[in-house]
Regions:
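Glycine-rich phosphate/diphosphate-binding loop of Rossmann-like nucleotide-binding domains
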Residues: 2-40
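N-terminal beta-loop-helix "entrance" segment that forms/cooperates
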Residues: 33-54
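Glycine-rich phosphate-binding loop
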Residues: 48-86
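Glycine/charged-rich beta-loop-alpha catalytic/anionic-binding loops adjacent to active sites
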Residues: 2-3, 29-32, 80, 102-110
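Short glycine/serine/threonine-rich phosphate/pyrophosphate-binding segments
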Residues: 13-17, 41-45, 64-73, 92-95, ...
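C-terminal binding/interaction regions
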Residues: 8-15, 19, 95-166
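Glycine/small-residue-rich loop that forms an oxyanion/phosphate-binding "nest" at active or ligand-binding sites
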Residues: 77-102, 106
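Acidic, glycine/proline-rich low-complexity segments that act as flexible tails and inter-domain linkers
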Residues: 31, 43, 66, 158-166
Length: 166
């Protein structure tokens, strides 16, 4: 099966990036998770991005905060889809990260999820892979059905007890 790269600039991003890994694990998708700073160790980062294709990666999920160059640089070097996760920051609430990731120059696209959107990044990676994997597509459909059923259970409870006792 295809593999997904998960890369973050700092271990402080781990709580969010782990949500992407959790989704991939639930769906049976192999991944490799790394902490690499594009600013503090650019040589290590370039090697990672240049060798990702030969390692079997089909998608890279990159999370970053503040200047948030990691996702864009992955997209510039890695020839397949890059998904950016903007991290919440204390100074601007993650808007700085979001704008850095989403405002890419023409020809270097980064699929960008919500601020701290680790789970959706994992799901987007799975959906990309599922375009050529029928078994994975079936797992995604089952996952969507689980989400639907969770909402139905919550609504049934609301109807039974009312909003004041919910």
């Amino acid at each position: 099966m295809a593999k997904v790269g998960i890369v973050m600039g700092s271990d402080s991003d781990m709580p969010i990036m782990s949500k992407a890994a959790d989704i991939l694990e639930k769906l049976g998708i192999d991944y490799e998770m790394k902490i690499i700073s594009a600013h503090r160790e650019p040589d290590v980062f370039f090697e990672y991005a240049k060798t990702a294709e030969e390692k079997g990666f089909k998608v890279i999920i990159a999370g970053a905060g503040m200047a948030a160059h990691l996702p864009g640089m992955c997209a510039a070097i890695f020839p397949m889809p890059a998904i950016g996760i903007p991290m919440h920051t204390t100074s601007l609430g993650g808007r700085d990260s979001l704008y850095s990731i989403v405002q890419m120059p023409s020809g270097i696209p980064v699929a960008t999820v919500a601020i701290n959107g680790g789970a959706n990044a994992g799901l987007l990676a799975a959906k990309i892979l599922a375009t050529s994997d029928a078994e994975l597509l079936a797992k995604l459909k089952a996952y969507s059905q689980e989400l639907k059923e969770q909402v139905e259970v919550k609504d049934a409870r609301l109807q039974e007890v009312g909003y004041k006792n919910y």
